[in-house]
Amino acid sequence: MQARDCSFYLGGLSCGGYRGYFQEFADEFSVPVLIEGGFSSGAGKILEAVRQQLAQSGQCVETICCSAYAGKLDALGCKGVCFVNATSPHAPKAVLPTAVEQVLSLYDAYDQKMLVSKREELTAWTESGDRAFRRAARYLTAAASLLRENEQAVLTCTDLSKAEQLGRALAKRYLRENGANGRVHMRLLSAVTSDGIRFLPDVIRPIETLVVLEDEYGASADCILRVLQQHATERGLDIIACPCPVRPKHLEHLIFPQLSTAFVTANRYHSEYPGNPRRIHCTRVSEKSGLRVRRARLRFNRKMAEELMAQVFGALTEAGEAQKAVDAIYSAAEIPEQIEKLCLRAKELSSLDAGL
């Protein structure tokens, strides 16, 4: 899919719990390599070894960032091969192991006696992390409910037929026929993390045509983007579809690599975009007098949602600390020779193509 190096997320906390697209990512590649049986430390070393080899050989690499740990990888892809940390909660499945999916197992790469001796500590940290993550999910679900109430309030004074008409006009202007069968690639440009809602702008920077939909409440942008996606599919274009990390049923961004064109949503969590993009204020399809009447309620809900989001970030920090403690124990129990063998095997697999 990638014509240049690019970075995305593939999963993270959303309303209702964890939501990921790792299976969809693995299914895009001829040779999915699943790294099983360990925590982020072991899988991270394998992924980094492969990334460095591919970068040194001048290959374009798509890296998948970890939403739980800044600076760590969850997966990467290059040509027909991808590598995925397949531990929970990612857990893509090997349907035809060895025939299709290649599996790298970390189970034998740890000192069993050491881990058994740390069983109680590992259990305590794991349970603590799970409790914190569930608490974060509850806070996020409550915040999403308030944001949804705002969206519904704005929808009552929004003319969706005008939004659809705008989507069709944008499609006519920016989306040309490709004459092929396009594919939809599910990715995330932002994720809910312990540091807030993080946004990855690198994939947007080289885009030649950027259209920003200013939509604070998410009432119109999703409708416009759905129309654009439908027209792009009919015209055979490849699509990178980026849902909202908080409310996965809502589209936030669409990227069309073949056209170097993107339509993105701007709100308080990601409002700054590079260059001088065209900006469309979605209030143009809303009745402004209706928005003014509801302004006080909208502000109150938004303020309460922000307070709940602060609790989300705090709970995710607790969950992250617990996970780091577990990772540290597993990292100390690694058998270096076994990890090195897995890294070498991963490098061999990175040279496979669709014909093998």
Q: Over which residues does each language-model region extend?
A:
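Conserved nucleotide-sensing/catalytic segment adjacent to the nucleotide-binding pocket
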Residues: 2-18, 25, 30, 51-114, ...
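Internal, well-ordered alpha/beta segment that forms a basic, Gly-enriched binding/recognition surface
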Residues: 97, 101-137
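Glycine-rich phosphate-binding P-loop
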Residues: 31-52, 197-198, 206-232
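N-terminal low-complexity, Ser/Thr/acidic repeat segments characteristic of secreted
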Residues: 31, 176-182, 209, 347, ...
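An accessory alpha-helical subdomain
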Residues: 121-178, 297-345, 349
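A cross-family "folded-core" feature that marks the main globular domain of proteins
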Residues: 35-36, 46, 62-63, 96, ...
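N-terminal pre-Walker A segment at the start of P-loop NTPase domains
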Residues: 1-24, 161-202
